[in-house]
Curated annotation (Swiss-Prot):
Single annotated GO MF: chromatin binding
Name of the featured protein: Mini-chromosome maintenance complex-binding protein
Protein source organism: Dictyostelium discoideum (Social amoeba)
Gene that this sequence comes from: mcmbp
Biased composition (Basic and acidic residues): 194-211
Quaternary assembly: Interacts with the MCM complex.
């Protein structure tokens, strides 16, 4: 074992940790070979990056271009675990022999994917002196359903961290333009059939052009070299996404189809190599294990992506070696375990340490709360004073103050008066999209809802909604309007068009492909806290096949129980999740929900242009961030059964008695009243209380809930 006192004598500059991390690993290995296996490497790095400013300065990479530009440096990737491969056993170091001098040297093999051999060196394969280790291999994809404002903020933060301040002055000014031009125009095309037709014609034309472009190889593209490395890499990524011979969603195993014309979708998945999987511990001092669908930020080294391979042509032996692009390669490969072809399809990432990200926490500075204070094995992270990182990974009590670093001082936790003001403004903002005031209240509750416990088969806190609309063209754009609203306010959301084709043909339920030994992703493989909009208005007459029936059953199970049964062929694997669902249908919904509401038939929904004008003139980025912070605060506010202070215990006890008496009275008036209804009332009253910044149910909030319910029932009776 390494003597800590001796190790302290090894002085390594902080800049070397950030700019040449592999040099640090090599120095630690040369100092003592045991440093590779006793946790010294990640402990030394944690000592450095536990400083908040240093951690923020580490570049966040997400595209192939960014990976290549930062190759060899310490970088971060933020992603979702889509699959966990079988562990690999590897030697801790390799013996390398100099053929000319017979000198033998040792080289560390951890955190690397290649062996550095000189011309006169060879690898000694029959050496058994090296101790072995098993590394965990994760397949990680870009966080699904992430909305554009999150990507924009991440990019802005990344620019700030890299001292690219020249563009920062335009960030706030471009916020409304981004919403109006990117989100709103997209929705306008979705609603307007004529525009959709024109758009499809343009895309078909682009597709033909891109198809002809992809036939050229990278070796003959001198023009690409003149455009620079960044332009070349973007071209490769776009070729990969738009190639007609392959289904990139299948290759990359994305749960939802991606739009190849959207530059935000140039993000790449990663194969993440984990060398120390006992870094983070729970409150019981047990190592936290990796699970699929979790969002994690890894810190480590990314291997330089190599999109071309040298191979021997099978058709003509006299041609010798030829260079094949990744496009051509993927079109002829039968993709087996993706971990066997990492250099050709997906960049390799060697993780030194990592942070679990809370899927429920976001604000406009950093969309997720990074858990730098989660228990680290050497306890060197506990000095991190970042307010945004004060939450333990497994802490579900939602004691959250990650809005305290908001420079606009829009934290709704300041006082109830400020909170109520923001609440009223947010209701007004929601009404801008859907007009109906009662529906706006229930949408607010849906926005701040989350499952906080699974007990006896119940998902406590689940608040799934059914919205019934008249079979009228006037109301057919409601799903798109709610989609736009959610894209502006939430970090992650997705509208699933429940057309007959999608039900019968689209991968919705993830399943295990035993031939390729991987989980094939589906729509329901999403991180917790992703809001799903189920658009039943797209359903037309036709036959629902067995696959479609399976999809409907899965959506119903998700909506009510918040669980997804992954199809492992011989037996289902039940995965608990939290994907708040909202279904919109003409009349009665095919998807069960915890509540149903009908929109007011007398209202007139706004057009996209009308919303656009309102957003531009009335809502700037600061105001939108205030709404996002309010939702984040309410979603993560610690809720208690009774008052936490002695001064209001009497008030809390009175509320408890009032609730009990009200339920007894309700059962006396209606013999059909069940405990399920009472559970729903408790859930709804809890959301009402949280929306007013109350941490327990008060009598007035219970009465507000009952009043809202009476109005909601009237809308259902009018169906």
């Amino acid at each position: 074992m390494t003597d800590n006192n001796n190790l302290d004598s090894l002085i390594i500059d902080k800049d070397e940790y950030l700019n040449s991390p592999m040099n640090v690993v090599d120095k630690l290995f040369k100092f003592d070979q045991n440093n590779l296996n006793n946790g010294t490497v990640y402990k030394k790095f944690e000592n450095v990056i536990s400083e908040d400013q240093i951690y923020k300065s580490i570049p966040l990479v997400s595209t192939i271009n960014q990976c290549d530009l930062n190759s060899g440096k310490l970088v971060k990737i933020r992603c979702m675990i889509q699959d966990i491969f079988d562990p690999q056993f590897c030697p801790s170091f390799n013996k390398i022999k100099n053929i000319e001098t017979n000198e033998i040297r040792l080289e560390a093999s951890k955190y690397k994917d290649k062996i550095n051999l000189n011309d006169c060196e060879e690898l000694i394969f029959d050496s058994f002196d090296s101790s072995t280790f098993d590394k965990t291999i994760l397949y990680c994809i870009p966080i699904p359903c992430e909305n554009k404002w999150v990507n924009n903020n991440n990019n802005n933060n990344n620019n700030n961290n890299n001292n690219n301040n020249n563009n920062n002055n335009n960030n706030n000014n471009n916020g409304n333009e981004q919403i109006s031009s990117s989100l709103l125009n997209k929705k306008k095309r979705n609603i307007d059939d004529a525009d959709m037709k024109n758009e499809n014609d343009e895309e078909n034309k682009k597709s033909k052009d891109q198809k002809s472009t992809t036939t050229t190889t990278t070796t003959t593209s001198k023009e690409g070299e003149e455009e620079g490395e960044e332009g070349e890499q973007l071209t490769k990524s776009k070729k990969l996404l738009t190639n007609n011979k392959i289904d990139i969603n299948k290759i990359f195993n994305y749960p939802i189809p991606i739009d190849s014309n959207d530059e935000n979708n140039l993000k790449t998945p990663f194969i993440v190599n984990i060398y120390d999987d006992d870094i983070i511990f729970d409150e019981n001092n047990k190592a936290v294990t990796f699970k699929i669908n979790e969002i994690i930020e890894f810190v480590g080294v990314v291997a330089k992506f190599n999109p071309t391979l040298q191979h021997q042509s099978s058709n003509s032996s006299d041609q010798g070696e030829t260079t094949t692009t990744i496009i051509d390669l993927m079109s002829m490969l039968d993709v087996d375990e993706i971990s066997t072809i990492p250099d050709t399809l997906i960049p390799q990432f060697h993780a030194i340490t990592y942070r679990y990200l809370d899927p429920y926490k976001f604000n406009h500075l950093n969309p997720f709360s990074i858990d730098t204070n989660t228990t680290i094995n050497n306890n060197n992270n506990n000095n991190n004073n970042n307010n945004n990182n004060n939450n333990n990974n497994n802490n579900n009590n939602n004691n959250n103050n990650n809005n305290n670093n908001n420079p606009n001082n829009n934290n709704p936790n300041n006082n109830n008066l400020n909170n109520n003001l923001i609440r009223n403004e947010l209701i007004k903002f929601i009404k801008l999209f859907i007009v109906d005031e009662l529906l706006s209240e229930y949408l607010l509750f849906h926005l701040i809802s989350k499952v906080y416990s699974f007990t006896s088969g119940l998902s406590i806190g689940n608040f799934s909604m059914n919205i019934s609309i008249p079979n009228d063209k006037e109301f057919q754009r409601l799903p798109q309007l709610i989609e736009l609203l959610y894209e502006i306010l939430l970090a992650r959301s997705y509208r699933f068009s429940m057309s007959l084709e999608n039900l019968n043909d689209m991968d919705v339920v993830p399943y295990k492909d035993y031939d390729r030994n991987r989980i094939v992703s589906g729509l329901l493989q999403l991180p917790k806290g992703t809001n799903l909009i189920l658009d039943e208005t797209q359903l037309t007459e036709g036959k629902v096949e067995s696959q479609g029936i399976k999809v409907l059953n899965a959506l119903n199970t998700l909506s009510i129980q918040q669980k997804v049964e992954y199809d492992f062929k011989y037996h289902p694997i039940e995965i608990q999740t939290d994907l708040p669902t909202i279904s919109i249908s003409f009349g009665k919904s095919l998807i069960k929900g915890t509540t149903q509401i009908s929109i007011n038939k007398s209202i007139q929904l706004p057009t996209i242009n009308e919303i656009n004008q309102q957003l531009i003139h009335s809502y700037n980025n600061d105001k939108l961030n205030q709404f996002r912070n309010y939702i984040n605060h309410c979603k993560n506010l610690s809720f208690k059964i009774s008052s936490p202070t002695t001064t209001t215990i009497a008030e809390s006890d009175d509320a408890t008695r009032h609730i009990q008496e009200d339920f007894v009275k309700s059962r006396q008036l209606d013999s059909k009243m069940t405990t399920d209804v009472f559970h729903y009332w408790l859930t709804l009253s809890r959301l009402v209380a949280l929306s007013f910044n109350d941490q327990y149910i008060k009598i007035d909030k219970w009465n507000i809930m009952k009043s809202l319910e009476e109005k909601r029932k009237l809308t259902i009776n009018n169906l």
